[in-house]
Design a protein with these regions (language model features):
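An acidic, glycine-rich "communication" segment
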Residues: 44, 126-202, 210-215, 219
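Alpha-helical scaffolding within the catalytic cores
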Residues: 71-78, 100-106, 170-174
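Aromatic-Pro/Gly-enriched surface loop or interdomain linker
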Residues: 17-88, 92-95, 185, 193-194, ...
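Short alpha-beta junction capping motif
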Residues: 36, 88-127
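Extracytoplasmic/secreted envelope proteins and their assembly/folding machinery
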Residues: 51-58, 104, 108, 126, ...
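Sec-dependent N-terminal signal peptides
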Residues: 4-13
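Surface-exposed patches in mature extracellular/periplasmic domains of secreted proteins
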Residues: 67-77, 119-122, 140-148, 231
Length: 231
């Protein structure tokens, strides 16, 4: 399973960032370093939360898979013409998100054309994120993914689904998704706070085994998303 998935990701990383190549007119299509794009948004929420998390995750991806990924993520807005060079978009924060009509249209097109969004609830994100997803896809609702979904078994095994990393309200961790033509385009990690577990070891009081679960799930998400990019 691991070797097959890595082969798919290696092939995908050599191809165009958007699988079917239908980037909108005016969008720049250049060879970009393989990395995670962190979404900047308006509305008052701290999109920049957990600043050491993504660099640490990228380091673990390099170490565990051998993929040549960048040392740091890029920070990007939905209106940036380089958006289509990054098939993995990451969103986090504690507060409110608000997209403009233009951003909604871009995100809808980005996801329909092969992009992947991972939204990581850093506590306090849930209400506004669900609202904005209804604006992106008015005819869809986020659905909870079963524990046998491939994202939980892409590289590491999570037989019980999304791991619980930070306690917050003590609610169980849940993974939700939105689909386009059978493809998972949005993964929403709720009441898990993976980014908390990716942060520097001295930042929070997470034990090593909890941080390990967070990194493993992060590797799964990255590889799963990139394996969907086909030449």
């Amino acid at each position: 399973m691991k070797s097959t998935l890595l082969a798919a990701v290696l092939l995908a990383s050599l191809s165009a960032p958007v699988p079917d190549g239908r980037a909108p007119e005016g969008a720049e299509r250049v060879r970009a370093e393989l990395t995670i794009a962190q979404l900047q948004y308006d509305g008052g929420g701290d999109w920049y939360a957990n600043p050491s998390g993504l660099p640490n995750l990228l380091a673990e991806i390099r170490k565990r898979t051998g993929l040549r990924v960048a040392e740091r993520p890029v920070q990007i807005r939905l209106t940036d013409p380089n958006l289509y060079n990054y098939p993995y978009l990451y969103l986090t924060g504690h507060g409110n998100i608000r997209f403009t009509p233009e951003e909604l249209q871009v995100l809808r097109q980005y996801l329909a054309n092969g992009g992947f969004l991972h939204a990581d609830d850093n506590y306090g994100l849930d209400e506004s994120f669900r609202r904005e997803m209804r604006r992106v896809f008015p005819d869809q609702e986020l659905v909870e993914l079963p524990a046998d979904h491939p994202v939980y078994h892409a590289f590491y095994e999570f037989p019980d689904g999304l791991p619980k990393i930070h306690q917050h309200d003590g609610k169980p961790a849940q993974g939700f998704g939105l689909f386009q033509e059978g493809r998972l385009v949005v993964f929403y990690s709720y009441e898990s706070d993976l980014g908390n577990g990716w942060e520097d070891a001295d930042r929070y009081d997470n034990p090593p085994e909890t941080r390990e679960k967070a990194f493993r799930m992060g590797v799964n998400l990255f590889l799963y998303a990139l394996a969907q990019v086909t030449p």
